[in-house]
Amino acid sequence: MSKYTILDKINTPSDLKLIPESQLKILSAELRAFLVDTLDVSGGHFASSLGATELTVALHYVYNAPYDNIVWDVGHQTYIHKILTGRKDKLVTIKKDGGISGFPKRSESEYDTFGVGHSSTSISAALGMAIADRLQGKSSNTVAVIGDGAITGGMAFEALNHAGGIKEDILVILNDNEMSISDNVGGLSAHFSKIISGGFYNSIREKGKEVLKNIPPIFEFVKKVETQTKGMFVPANFFEDLGFYYVGPIDGHDVTELVKTLRILKDHKGPKLLHVITKKGKGYTKAESDPIKFHHVAPSFHSGENVITKASKPTYSNIFGDWICQKAAKDKRLVGITPAMKEGSDLIRFSQLYPHRYFDVAIAEQHAVTFAGGLACQGLKPVVAIYSTFLQRAYDQVIHDIALQNLDVLYAVDRAGLVGADGATHDGSFDLAFMRCIPNHVIMTPSDENEAYHMLELGYEYNGPAMVRYPRGAGIGAEITDSLDLELGKAKIVKQGSKIAILNFGTLLPLAKQLAEKYHATVIDMRFVKPLDEIMLDKVSQTHEIILTLEENCIAGGAGSAVNEYFVAKDLSNKIIVRNFGLQDKFLNHGTKDLLLAQSKLCVENISQELDKLI
């Protein structure tokens, strides 16, 4: 007999609505158990979905998705949503090649109303949907679910300001898993919130306001008392000042209370914000104790059959973490900045050793970059540790605030290139293209860990903005040396061959060496995208017939394009054959990195096919 007696009956939200409300608590427990069992096989984002279980059940119980729009922010918390919307049996394939995505994806399900992976987008998207439906005469409801971390992003505030200003009918649910209210106040707050969210209070409050508006002094007094009274029990919030009807905080794990509150708010028109308190990792003791560790789990995390051992080779993030700690010990001007990526960027040790020189600015990439600019203006040396995919979000600041003023800011760009299982939303496919066109920048592409370490050093000492990009995961195990023959804008000949020259940008150097063995080709580690080693390009063009460029970045506008531009400017394009190999002009699905590289023709077999046609 199945242990999922209720869950087995549910494949869609329509099935969920047939379940008696009294059984929703049991269903929530079954969903958690199913999530544990499934991710023990597949791995995936874990703690966030555990924390949002009751909220997800209540949303699909009250609202009529997909007619009603439920928009999720970031997407880490949507595994329960996927289970309840026809993908229960596919959850074991999550983030695998040919399997379902780890994030909401419009092409995957009609219930995934808006594709996501980055944060702070939900309210903007939901507002657009609400207005579009209203303009087309559709009577749907629209809900945005956003976490207390994501709501710190500036885009979320912009959307709140817009929605409140135009009084659009939209519900924003703030999923707060940081427990910002102390326990002794929390009980009173929950009690008071039940009164505030009650239908009777709603009715009296709105009708009373209409009457009291005719007596301005009394109206202002009552309004002030209500605001001050709520302020005694809830965090000082500005949501009502933005035009939102604020309700909460309420217990995000009380599914009965959630259903009751959502039903009331569904009938309340205008912009509304429901503040729910949840616990990340709820229902799994280890995840509750260490939600960061259990944010994402590997297969067998629960059964323990395959214990994951620590990688024998350090990751590129580890190399950065070591470098910044060592450099900070020598230079008191160094400050480290990250937009909510302390663990991923390996800044934990730095934050512990130098807490007054470490700044986690939360999910605020634009602020992170301009903040670094302000630090640089006053003589400090800021290092911005940021993922490639998130650097995109601060593009104007990179240009206007840093490059235009030629400020000393070092960008340590992690997760450059393909990231694998997280897919297109997290791939670092474009940074070479969008950074290369900006004046005053130095752009470095290390081929191994040792180059990465010394390029960070070179970029730090450079007078102006500099960027070092490196991939996710471990390198080749290169030893970190005390010194390296590394000169600004100078490439390195790795292997001398003839006829064919392979210009490598970044960590595809092993691929270049494999091709060189097969074709007796010259291999050059270009190291710098900007400035290019033009002397090396001149030499190569004079001594070789075919030139290949390799990069784990989009071909359009990337390092290969820079080489093409140089050869065209020198009138050499008709004298040599140049072929660029990089990421194709399309978004890739999730999968293993080797598979995605092969799909991008970045493998010996595919490049050999092209070369054989040219020889």
UniProtKB/Swiss-Prot annotation:
GO biological process: 1-deoxy-D-xylulose 5-phosphate biosynthetic process; isopentenyl diphosphate biosynthetic process, methylerythritol 4-phosphate pathway; terpenoid biosynthetic process; thiamine biosynthetic process
Pfam families in the record: DXP_synthase_N (PF13292), Transket_pyr (PF02779), Transketolase_C (PF02780)
InterPro entries reported in the protein's UniProt record: Dxylulose-5-P_synthase, THDP-binding, Transketo_C/PFOR_II, Transketolase-like_Pyr-bd, Transketolase_BS, Transketolase_C, Transketolase_CS
Function in brief: Catalyzes the acyloin condensation reaction between C atoms 2 and 3 of pyruvate and glyceraldehyde 3-phosphate to yield 1-deoxy-D-xylulose-5-phosphate (DXP).
One CC-aspect GO term: cytosol
UniProt pathway annotation: Metabolic intermediate biosynthesis; 1-deoxy-D-xylulose 5-phosphate biosynthesis; 1-deoxy-D-xylulose 5-phosphate from D-glyceraldehyde 3-phosphate and pyruvate: step 1/1
Reactions the enzyme catalyzes: D-glyceraldehyde 3-phosphate + pyruvate + H(+) = 1-deoxy-D-xylulose 5-phosphate + CO2
Name the UniProt record assigns to this protein: 1-deoxy-D-xylulose-5-phosphate synthase
Keywords: Isoprene biosynthesis, Magnesium, Metal-binding, Thiamine biosynthesis, Thiamine pyrophosphate, Transferase
Domain of life, per lineage: Bacteria
Entry cofactors: Mg(2+); thiamine diphosphate
GO MF annotation list: 1-deoxy-D-xylulose-5-phosphate synthase activity; magnesium ion binding; thiamine pyrophosphate binding
Annotated source species: Francisella tularensis subsp. novicida (strain U112)
Protein family according to the UniProt entry: Belongs to the transketolase family. DXPS subfamily.
UniProt binding sites for thiamine diphosphate: H76, G117, H118, S119, G149, A150, N177, Y284, E365
EC nos: 2.2.1.7
